[in-house]
Amino acid sequence: MQMSEPLSQKNALYTAMNRFLGAVNNMDQTVMVPSLLRDVPLDQEKEQQKLTNDPGSYLREAEADMYSYYSQLKSIRNNIEWGVIRSEDQRRKKDTSASEPVRTEEESDMDLEQLLQFHLKGLHGVLSQLTSQANNLTNRYKQEIGISGWGQ
């Protein structure tokens, strides 16, 4: 059961993160045997096109199966819930601080605001796509094990 969200909250980053986390948690609870996802193509139509168009394409995209998406989505969920490793953040700060040109405070404030807006829009879009992928993976898993109408 989904609750209707006010229009102002529908596009909020927090709401998008909660939708993503909910979709991944649902996926995690539904997928009881993740190893069944190995070698299952992400999209059946794409798989048919690969087999007919380019005989070597399956080798290049061998890792693009549902299990790799499952692992990736769970990893992203863990990063959102628990944060990324602190040492990676410190390393990035050192790399960016060494290469930044000197700016005035007013320019920095304006740049930071624009930069924040840019990243928030991008993050919202990425979270929406990841939520869709988690829901699709859950539905495909249900189809694969024969419970496609269960739990809706």
From Swiss-Prot:
UniProt keyword ATP-binding present: no
One of the record's GO cellular component terms: nucleus
Subcellular compartments: Nucleus; Cytoplasm; Cytoplasm, Cytoskeleton
Expression across tissues: Expressed for a short period in the cells that will produce the enveloping layer (EVL).
Assigned keywords, A-Z: Cytoplasm, Cytoskeleton, Microtubule, Nucleus
InterPro entries in alphabetical order: Lipogen_MT_Stabilize_sf, Spot_14
Region (Disordered): 87-109
One example of a Gene Ontology biological process annotation: regulation of lipid biosynthetic process
Basic and acidic residues bias (residue ranges): 87-105
Function of the protein: Involved in stabilization of microtubules. May play a role in the regulation of lipogenesis.
Family statement drawn from the similarity comment of this UniProt entry: Belongs to the SPOT14 family.
Protein name: Mid1-interacting protein 1A
Organism: Danio rerio (Zebrafish)
Phylogenetic lineage: Eukaryota, Metazoa, Chordata, Craniata, Vertebrata
